[in-house]
Amino acid sequence: IHAFPDGIAERAMKKLSDTAGFPHYSLGTEEDTRRILTDCGIDIGVLLPIATKPSQQTSVNNWAAKVNKGNIVSFGTVHPDNTEYLDELDRIKALGLKGVKIHPDYQGFFLFEERLMPFWKRCAELKLPVTIHMGYDPVSPENRHAMPQDLVFIHEKVPNVDIIAAHMGGIFCWEAVFRYICGDRHIW
């Protein structure tokens, strides 16, 4: 699930709705998210926050840790352009967050970039699963920043990093999902 601190939730939901071209059905706040989970009979929702700017990772993770209770289990986030992102991975683990969410389209990188190898290695060492927005995204419709074949590249170098390939492995790239990642025991 995606939710935001109260002070930015309305603005964030409007921006996401406008970019995607369809309405949102949540206020995007912690309180409304918990209400929806309860009303729908969902025991636990996994919060997947995103630091869209390098300067946001600490504050986003502080908020994620604050709401990491009851029916919300939180992941943390890092931004690969923040020079402290490896230290932030250690902090994510110490905060009790359950994994890491990255969104290459919003964060402006491609999964296959060599500069990310320390990230993958550290996540594997810390046993932090990584959730990735995969395939198409309306924010950058001409570029696919995270494709199933990129996960093969990552696992050749860091075979034991656990990856949750969101959107069934990649929006609008289903054939590549079957070809490249089905059956990999470290990709969910």
Predicted regions and their residues:
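Mid-domain alpha/beta scaffold segments of enzyme catalytic cores
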Residues: 1-118, 122, 126, 175, ...
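Catalytic pocket-lining loop regions of alpha/beta-barrel enzymes
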Residues: 98-99, 112-188
